[in-house]
Amino acid sequence: MLIYEIESEAVYAIGDMHGAFEPLINWIKRNDLKNCVIICCGDIGFGFERPGHYEQIAHKFEKECSERNCVVIMLRGNHDDPSYFDGNKVDYPHFKAVPDYSIIKTCGKNILCIGGGISVDRHERIINQRANAYKYARWHNMPLDEAEKQIERKVYWENEGVVYDDEKLDEIKKSGINIDVICSHTCPSFCEPLTKEGIKEWLLMDKELESDLNEERSTMDRILERLKSDGQNIKKWIYGHFHYHYHNFDSVGGIDYVMLDMFREYQNKFDMIEI
């Protein structure tokens, strides 16, 4: 469990980025954001390009955010290479990809970050990745399994899902830190969306998808129940993943749940709320 203590005057959360790094820099400038923390709730877009691409992006954020005293915190989604979220690979003063179960302490709040999720389009992405590996193997005259390890630009990672981590939850309990807010990529089973109407085509292609999605939401239920049983007094839970905004303004068990939309390029807009 990593704890990030950051001095700031405000803390915000935004939904899925899907590689919209430059638009986020412009958003920060356009809204004149200063002395703040911005938590990005997964699907950042790490891993689809070569490592050097993200190093360049990080330097751009450092230049802009250091002048404004803004810190961008990113947690992993299902459109991310999990290796970027080890706490070391992307750990700049103002631009950080944090591990699951990290705690952000800022503005008098303790915010627990829980990444991971299942890709509804994983069947298609796996096929595309296998096709890329075949091409690489043929071009470099090597076995397919070796090519799959070496291709730089991947589009799917098998270890994308949410992880229930007893050890990390034990650490949180022993630390005595009260969690005020949870920021995650996906959410518990009783939160929106409550149906799978929008993903029927993916369910037809991927016979194990529905059970895996149900298990994902059940895992979030288990995490919540464990935190509650440990005496945590959580007030707000913010998540992304589902690509629309929802807030029913009625708390569930004393917790206010907010789902954030993804970055909309045609609107040039992030779905951002203050925590």
Regions found by a protein language model. Give the residues of each.
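Structural motif
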Residues: 30-31, 172-174, 227-229
